[in-house]
Amino acid sequence: IFAANEGLCGAFNLLLYKKLLETLQEYDGKVKSPVFVYPVGRKLVNDIKRTRGVEVMPIPDLFEKKQYAEGATALADELIRRFLEKDVDRVEVIYAHYKSMGTQIISREQLLPWVPQETKALSDKERNKVYIYEPDCEEILETIYPLVIHSTMYRYLLENQTSEQASRILSMQMANDNAIKLLKNLQLEYNKLRQQNITAELMDIVGGSIE
């Protein structure tokens, strides 16, 4: 699960954590071993540790050093290794998909086993062509497969970081707008009180002059 390292980003971390709880609820009773969670982002680590039915796993130190591309690759390699060794049956990633500055969608996608995306059907002309692969298809797949997982993991990370910054900008903009509105209301209240004080002083002066 990808989250934020810092706060001041609205409900960003909370929504990611809720998505994790929904996922755990789906798995409840369906798996015997605990669900292994790799939390990338300091803000959710303590909450996840207190969550029932999960085992929090360490992530590469590269993330703390802000070497994000290398960290994503190292994490992907760790997940691939555990999957091939049958330590885990399935790997899913929870992250914030960046759609636009005002829209970030909390998503959950399957990383392993990798399912290729559907492509458009080939025309008869293309389908009848014969291709010779060198080296063979199996060797090509063994080389490309990790690269696809690496790039996909890095994409999840970048989208989540972009969504985090967008949420932070929007939160700060809302806070700024609320502060400006509050200042205007306070200024209006101050002007009213000032006018009341001036009126009271004038009434005292006029009353004193009449006497």
List the model feature ranges, each with a label.
Residues 1-211:
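C-terminal beta-strand-loop-alpha-helix "lid" module of Rossmann-like NAD(P)-dependent dehydrogenases
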